[in-house]
Amino acid sequence: AELNKLKIWACYYYHQMGFNVTHIIPSENIKRDKDNYLKKNPFKSSTNNRENYDIIRQSNVDMETFDWHNAKGIGTVAGFNGLRSLDFDGSTNTALLSTVLKILGLPENYEWVVTSGSNNGFHILFYCGNFEFAGYKRRLKRYFPNKKHKTYFKCIDFIWYNHLILPPSLHKTGNNYKFLNVEYPFEKPLLVAGYNLRNMLFELCYEYGGFNIIKN
């Protein structure tokens, strides 16, 4: 998909899938963050105000007001209707991905696996209710691998209420986010049980009686 078709993807695909949609204009984000003395990745921040997007359904009129002509990315907000994401950083290991999908009870060719624009990580989108290890509202929790898996990935971020970047958004490297197994998913993300997430953490991150985590 081309970036100049972002509005079409937003209005006629992601929004119809049930997502609340954001748009990303890096140049506008840089100016805004500079004025507010903030340091954020301009390719990952929503340009529009996304306050309450995790609890209130977005209207079509709201999306129509966005500057899609200049947008370089599209996103959504985790938390709405239980939409979640796992962000595996520092990994291109297909064996790891297969293991994770199996533990989570997802098909091996799961449609909602996204290859990061960095080409050094992947995201898995799914639905899930409350999960005690996921962190607090508007904060992410990061887990690090145990010794057995330290060469497989750098960390896992639980994106529970935060901003998610969606294909075909532009990454700062100049690459685009892409779905791994399909051009675009046909079905909505699947439901993952909390106990499967717990099993994944114990397999990949548990060591010496606890988890090595950072709260952001």
Question: PLM features: residue spans?
Answer:
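Conserved phosphate/metal-binding and DNA-contacting active-site motifs used
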Residues: 1-216
